[in-house]
């Protein structure tokens, strides 16, 4: 049973927006460059991957950085650009003991496409 709780739960962008309005917090795991081009209102940016000279690599300080913004029992919705990084980030957070995390299907691309509130 405990193993099942480590399987990420995913929600649509419309459900994610409703959760945000209900008090959940938005963790945007895109790069700072992507985040600066537009993000969901109120989102906190902690990159899951860093862009370096040799391409993208996992942020070794991701869990520590997330922990500086969120508690392990906080309700968090996790998004990236299209869903690939956020599902991995959500899985890592669950394995690290975060209990209220949900992945956003389609990420920021789907969020913006659905006309949900954004900020540049």
Curated annotation (Swiss-Prot):
Class of the enzyme per the UniProt entry, highest EC level: transferase
Keywords: Chloroplast, Plastid, Transferase
UniProt domain Rhodanese: residue ranges: 20-120
EC number(s) from the headed UniProt entry: 2.8.1.1
Subcellular location, principal: plastid
SUPFAM superfamilies: Rhodanese/Cell cycle control phosphatase
GO cellular component, one term: chloroplast
Compartments, record wording: Plastid, Chloroplast
InterPro entries the record matches: Rhodanese-like_dom, Rhodanese-like_dom_sf, Thiosulfate_ST/Rhodanese-like
Catalytic activity: thiosulfate + hydrogen cyanide = thiocyanate + sulfite + 2 H(+)
SMART domains recorded: RHOD
Disulfide pattern: none
Superkingdom field: Eukaryota
Record: active site: 80 (cysteine persulfide intermediate)
GO MF entry, a single one: thiosulfate-cyanide sulfurtransferase activity
Binding site for substrate: 85
Subunit structure: Monomer.
Function statement: Thought to act during the early stages of leaf senescence. Catalyzes the transfer of a sulfur ion from a donor to cyanide or to other thiol compounds. Substrate preference is thiosulfate > 3-mercaptopyruvate.
Protein's UniProt name: Thiosulfate sulfurtransferase 16, chloroplastic
Organism (species): Arabidopsis thaliana (Mouse-ear cress)
Lineage: Eukaryota, Viridiplantae, Streptophyta, Embryophyta, Tracheophyta
């Amino acid at each position: 049973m405990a193993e099942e709780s480590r399987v990420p739960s995913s929600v649509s962008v419309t459900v994610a927006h409703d959760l945000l309005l209900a008090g959940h917090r938005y963790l945007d795991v895109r790069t700072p460059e992507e985040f600066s081009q537009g993000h969901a209102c109120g989102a906190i940016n902690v990159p899951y991957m860093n862009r370096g000279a040799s391409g993208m690599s996992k942020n070794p300080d991701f869990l520590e950085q997330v922990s500086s913004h969120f508690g392990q029992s906080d309700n968090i919705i996790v998004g990236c650009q299209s869903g690939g990084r956020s599902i991995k980030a959500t899985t890592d957070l669950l394995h690290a003991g975060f209990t209220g995390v949900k992945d956003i299907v389609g990420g920021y691309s789907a969020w913006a496409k659905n006309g949900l509130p954004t900020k540049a």
